[in-house]
């Protein structure tokens, strides 16, 4: 069985490709992660998002600890073939390990001299409640 579709992706020197995760329907950008070949293949096979965790050095099935899995509707490759876009349904409405809907919850306001980052999205569920009793308590 040929998997030439995997070869079309321009993997970086570490065998990874950046992945943008967008919510189907709202079009909110939920998160940014990386995949290796195995993660992309498992995502296609399972219909759920699987990433490569650079900190844990292993595959990471999104939601494996929190239950907040991502059902994949569509996978797109950008024009340079070096970035992937996943369009997903976010189960539980929480994509971020901080308990927020999306990881992009800090907004820059101000100017170059006195600007700062401000939290603009609420915590929907306390991360300690999400990950309570999970081995290692590693927030995704």
UniProtKB/Swiss-Prot annotation:
UniProt catalytic activity: 1-(5-phospho-beta-D-ribosyl)-5'-AMP + H2O = 1-(5-phospho-beta-D-ribosyl)-5-[(5-phospho-beta-D-ribosylamino)methylideneamino]imidazole-4-carboxamide
Signal peptide: none
HAMAP family (UniProt xref): HisI
One of the Pfam families matching this protein, by short name: PRA-CH
Subunit organization: Homodimer.
UniProt GO BP: L-histidine biosynthetic process
Protein name: Phosphoribosyl-AMP cyclohydrolase
């Amino acid at each position: 069985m040929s998997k030439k579709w995997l070869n079309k992706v321009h993997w970086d020197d570490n065998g990874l490709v950046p992945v943008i995760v967008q919510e189907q329907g709202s079009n909110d950008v939920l998160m940014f992660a990386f995949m290796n070949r195995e993660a992309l293949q498992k995502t296609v096979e399972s219909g759920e998002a699987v990433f490569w965790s650079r900190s844990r050095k292993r595959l990471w099935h999104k939601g494996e600890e929190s239950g907040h899995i991502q059902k994949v509707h569509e996978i797109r490759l950008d024009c340079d073939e070096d970035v992937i876009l996943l369009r997903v349904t976010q189960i539980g409405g929480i994509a971020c390990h901080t308990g927020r809907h999306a990881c992009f919850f800090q907004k820059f306001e101000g100017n170059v001299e006195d600007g700062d980052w401000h939290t603009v999205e609420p915590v929907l569920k306390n991360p300690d409640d999400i990950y309570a009793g999970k081995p290692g308590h590693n927030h995704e």
